[in-house]
Amino acid sequence: MQHVNHSSFDKASKAGFIIALGIVYGDIGTSPLYTMQSLVENQGGISSVTESFILGSISLIIWTLTLITTIKYVLVALKADNHHEGGIFSLYTLVRKMTPWLIVPAVIGGATLLSDGALTPAVTVTSAVEGLKVVPSLQHIFQNQSNVIFATLFILLLLFAIQRFGTGVIGKLFGPIMFIWFAFLGISGLLNSFAHPEVFKAINPYYGLKLLFSPENHKGIFILGSIFLATTGAEALYSDLGHVGRGNIHVSWPFVKVAIILSYCGQGAWILANKNAGNELNPFFASIPSQFTMHVVILATLAAIIASQALISGSFTLVSEAMRLKIFPQFRSTYPGDNIGQTYIPVINWFLFAITTSIVLLFKTSAHMEAAYGLAITITMLMTTILLSFFLIQKGVKRGLVLLMMIFFGILEGIFFLASAVKFMHGGYVVVIIAVAIIFIMIIWYKGSKIVSRYVKLLDLKDYIGQLDKLRHDHRYPIYHTNVVYLTNRMEGDMIDKSIMYSILDKRPKKAQVYWFVNIKVTDEPYTAEYKVDMMGTDFIVKVELYLGFKMRQTVSRYLRTIVEELLESGRLPKQGKTYSVRPDSKVGDFRFIVLDERFSSSQNLKPGERFVMLMKSSVKHWTATPIRWFGLQFSEVTTEVVPLIFTANRGLPIKEKIELTTTGD
């Protein structure tokens, strides 16, 4: 997934328009497959609905899309870009310095977005495959729901299996396919609307408000739980800002919105014209002439796959950002594409696959999945509203205006949350359990890092310059390596982790010409790549601080190569000639990276709650990427040393020598 050129961020182009259709609108664009079906089924079936119910339902959909998707996300949230990047974690990095507790909505919003993403592929692909039930030549096969489940699972297996290869060339087809999809939605919806053109009266919000309080609405205000299905993809629209640019979203959204609304109007008109067609039919597929049904099912399946692909890729991006912000475990990541936007995280991929397939097997039909869908994303939207309010205050918008906006969207999304909360007992508990599990892991990881930062023992490097210099010239010890590089998470000024000096001096002393201490600082900007060097008045100690954006890969060896060359050219680092080398012009000696595998000991003197957090973090750490992979050191010379995580000077436990008194005979 390529990122938009920053110079064209606010501009729109024909190519950008098509790309946006393939990346941004998959989720919201496939909602017509199941939203109207959910509304009708909750009312008792096609034969039970009235014209006022259809008008009210379409009106609620139109105004939900207008208020939440258009106003909140397209017009307001897209302004909250972090150096042209969007999404809840990008928004968090913009405002996190305002108050520490903003980590709470960021963690909750990220976890619920990730958990809801596991349900989306299940419901969209199942809905598309169920369309085969109305294909005359295939009805005898797919009327059996077991065959629908088998086909859905097969598609999902293929989808998740190819993630490791990246989207590559096939990704270029997503935009044109989705253009055809939206064109079909608009045209078919318009043609079906001619049967009952009064459906266009639904643009008047009166019909929606009337339905909410009408006795013929069997669900009452809880009908909004089904209405919300129409706008679940709004958060993904904001998350993909960096991939397509603000200008292309502004231009493409009106086209998408009109196509979606026409589809709902067309389905509504068909229902009014065919009230005796049967309660089990999906209005979306039933409204298509039978000779085109097979083609539409194929197109719908492709659209569902593209929507699922966008959400899976979005999940990888979301987790990558959280890992670099140090609020999520550092799982192994690979980069199958040629650009920074394509990330593949095996653990997350197969976690999502397991959850998605389990949901298909548990709920079996798209109707049952819809009953669980949307609950978590309402929480994500509420968390985004909180963070967005702080962003607007930071930008100088009047507090009164921000408060009004926060109250308006808070109440609106709060109502949708309450309406969706009824889904908890109908399957919504699944995504809530997943979200709570993710939140638990994020809290453990975040709190564990804070505990280490608070208690870990640091030493002043200046106090050890003399010892390091003496070791360099001590002929009793053989040269360990020309350059020894320590990667540290903790370096504050001249203070470094005690474990590092323990490794150099207290174990077998590591004699080297140059000692490197490298620390990575993640910046609030997404694509920063800068460094600072402090040699502490020597030519044998190099402190390097790498400033990398939260979307940048932390491949230390490649950055260090550039830094070494620049230090040699400036004369700050003495040339290190090699006697033996295939490169006669080589100016630098060999490098050995030392990775310290810090192990927490339960004997550390911590409070019970802190001990629990550290023990849990140690358990989670077994599943994470090794530092060698995380820092891109697979092809470098690396030594991994197991060291204790030193919080305080470990005092010996109290013990007394047992002295036996001996008696001597008289």
Swiss-Prot record:
A cellular component term, taken from the record's GO annotations: plasma membrane
Q: Where are the transmembrane segments?
A: 16-36, 58-78, 99-119, 141-161, 167-187, 221-241, 253-273, 292-312, 343-363, 373-393, 402-422, 424-444
Secreted: present as a keyword of the record? no
Protein topology in the membrane: Multi-pass membrane protein
Please classify the protein's predominant subcellular localization into one broad category.
Answer: membrane
Keywords from the named record: Cell membrane, Ion transport, Membrane, Potassium, Potassium transport, Symport, Transmembrane, Transmembrane helix, Transport
Q: Where in the cell is it found?
A: Cell membrane
Q: Which GO terms describe its molecular function?
A: potassium ion transmembrane transporter activity; symporter activity
Its UniProt entry gives the catalysed reaction(s) as:
K(+)(in) + H(+)(in) = K(+)(out) + H(+)(out)
Instruction: Quote the function comment for this protein.
Output: Transport of potassium into the cell. Likely operates as a K(+):H(+) symporter.
Family the entry assigns: Belongs to the HAK/KUP transporter (TC 2.A.72) family.
Q: What is this protein called?
A: Probable potassium transport system protein Kup
Q: Species name for this entry?
A: Streptococcus agalactiae serotype III (strain NEM316)
